[in-house]
């Protein structure tokens, strides 16, 4: 699972996801990519599950880029605990995603194989996505 090595604060505020993604909105490294269509938070487990689904489909060919990183801590209170008495302990990491953000990119395999691999990855994610092809291909 992906997680940051060091953070300035153990617990963050939740924040809000508003507007479109301004950075990371174009296919930069690969030939074809998976782009988010709606807001959401992807956990490190979901990011890894989608990556494994892609890699199993394309087997040994091609290269995959993960364009997001889970750097936002997620906290939770223990089960059967009353409310109050502070914020819960950190339990994992998530990546806030805005619409228009490219999540994964693939290069080095045929377009049909890459589309199928990205479709399998999209089934593992909790947000709506679309497949985009790099300009000029």
Curated annotation (Swiss-Prot):
UniProt entry keywords in alphabetical sequence: Ribonucleoprotein, Ribosomal protein, RNA-binding, rRNA-binding, tRNA-binding
Gene3D superfamilies: Ribosomal protein L10e/L16
GO biological process: translation
SUPFAM superfamilies associated with the record: Ribosomal protein L16p/L10e
Matches recorded under CDD domains: Ribosomal_L16_L10e (cd01433)
Domain of life: Bacteria
Record-level Gene Ontology MF annotations: rRNA binding; structural constituent of ribosome; tRNA binding
InterPro entries (UniProt xref): Ribosomal_uL16 (IPR047873), Ribosomal_uL16_bact-type (IPR000114), Ribosomal_uL16_CS (IPR020798), Ribosomal_uL16_dom (IPR016180), Ribosomal_uL16_sf (IPR036920)
Cellular component aspect of the GO annotation: cytosolic large ribosomal subunit
PROSITE patterns in UniProt: RIBOSOMAL_L16_1
Cleaved signal peptide residues: none
Function: Binds 23S rRNA and is also seen to make contacts with the A and possibly P site tRNAs.
Subunit structure, interactors included: Part of the 50S ribosomal subunit.
NCBIfam families: rplP_bact
HAMAP family registered for this protein in UniProt: Ribosomal_uL16 (MF_01342)
Family membership noted in the UniProt record: Belongs to the universal ribosomal protein uL16 family.
Protein name (Swiss-Prot/TrEMBL): Large ribosomal subunit protein uL16
Species for this entry: Nitratidesulfovibrio vulgaris (strain DSM 19637 / Miyazaki F) (Desulfovibrio vulgaris)
């Amino acid at each position: 699972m992906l997680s940051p090595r060091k953070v300035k604060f153990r617990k963050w505020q939740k924040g809000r996801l508003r507007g479109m993604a301004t950075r990371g909105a174009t296919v930069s490294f690969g030939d074809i990519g998976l782009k988010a269509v709606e807001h959401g938070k992807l956990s490190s487990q979901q990011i890894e599950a989608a990556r494994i689904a892609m890699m199993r489909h394309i087997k040994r060919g091609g290269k995959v880029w993960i364009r997001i990183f889970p750097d936002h801590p997620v906290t939770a209170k223990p089960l059967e605990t009353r409310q109050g008495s502070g914020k819960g302990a950190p339990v994992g990491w998530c990546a806030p995603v805005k619409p228009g953000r490219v999540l994964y990119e693939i290069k080095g395999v045929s377009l049909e194989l890459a589309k199928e691999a990205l479709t399998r990855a999209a089934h593992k994610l909790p947000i709506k996505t679309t497949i985009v092809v790099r300009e000029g291909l």
